[in-house]
Amino acid sequence: MQRESFGSRLGFLLVSAGCAIGIGNVWRFPYITGKNGGGYFVLFYLVCLLLLGVPVMTMELAVGRGGRKSAVLAYKNLEKPGSKWHIHGWFCLAGCYLLMMYYTTVTGWMVNYFGKFLTGGFHAGMTGDEISGMFGTMLGSPGSMAIFTELVVVTGLIVCSFGLQKGLERVTKVMMICLLALIVVLAVHSLTLSGAAEGMKFYLLPSVDTIREHGLGSLITDAMNQAFFTLSLGIGAMEIFGSYMSDEQTLPGEAVRICILDTFVALMAGAIIFPACFTFGVAPGEGPALIFQTLPPLFVNMSGGRFWGTLFFLFMVFASFSTVLAVFENILAVCMDTFGISRKKAVLVNGVLLALLSLPCVFGYNIWSDFHPILGKDVLDSEDFLVSGLLLPIGSLVYLLFCVSKWGWGFDKYVAEANKGKGLKFAKWLKPYFQFILPALIVVIFLQGLL
């Protein structure tokens, strides 16, 4: 059977960017940018993206394009006879399942809040405490959460059931174009608020005092971590799209374009959040509290708030659901490639699996609220720790070592694949950096995540 491929280069770029762009762009990037000296952090972050994110992304894409299969079989096609690099492909699959065990639930939260704003569930006259309290009410309702979570699972698998071009690519292209338009409209509106100048000054104006307060080491560490984790590298989510690529463009050039789209969304998210927070005198935070407890009262209290709140959560639905679709495609591709089953059968089997696997996260805030499986963390944070703290950094290190070591694919073969086509190319003199410095940086990030 001939392997599926993207219908266009734009489709590849938007689907890959959709995989990278997610909730972390909104609920983490703006906060750590403001905390770490604004413009200085953005500068260090961009440098870290070029030095860390782009090279590792090209390695995942190169394994996919070179092997023309999903992770397990791509490794087998490229590894030396008798070696066991392909075992990592199974860990990639486990990482994708783990990620979807909680990401589908969080996406369900976004859908829930989009519906609340659209139908007037949040309205003028509600107090800030009432609006913020609705998040706790939602978490305490397992039935409601399960419905929205399973809605995400079913919708995602239905889209993917239509195939790469007619399903994933077609839907993601529309979502990503709408997402980019929405975030520009929301940012422009935020910049018209009375606290916009003060908010943007805190967000992006370079501040030496802030760096002194938190330390240059903290700035560099946060920049490295954000550059690494924002792209969701290490579990094969990008590798599968490499297997669907053409040979017409170089991988470094395409990786840079994906990073530009990801960074644009992250920067625009801050342009939405900080002006609103400073206008209403609210301290900007991070994580779910920012999205579900800090921002909804602000939307309700601003002119036309229901409209702007609806647009914001529609943007969040697109940002999170594009990641869900991308990872679902990876899971389905592994099942089709490795077990030789049809896409329809892979969808049916994984529909049951993902519907069941998503329930522990749903129950972790209510029925199983006393269950803290890892280091005292609740279910969602435990699942996230396994993915972000272990599988992403270790997986990225495995991809890197496979691509640059003589025991794996080998640096020369990797660079030849990465440089195939038109566009930006890696120079051969980068070999020592890729073989020694880059692995050390990933080990540092991994160890910091454990501390």
Spans of model-derived segments:
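Transmembrane helix-boundary motif of multi-pass solute transporters/channels
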Residues: G11-C48, G236-G242, G253-V256, I260-L261
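C-terminal membrane-solvent junction of multi-pass transporters and transport-like membrane proteins
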Residues: H88, L93, F339-G351, S382-I442
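Membrane-embedded translocation segments of transport machinery
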Residues: Q2-F6, E169, K173-F321, L325, ...
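Extracellular loop-to-transmembrane helix junctions
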Residues: E4, G34-M59, S144-M145, S388-P393
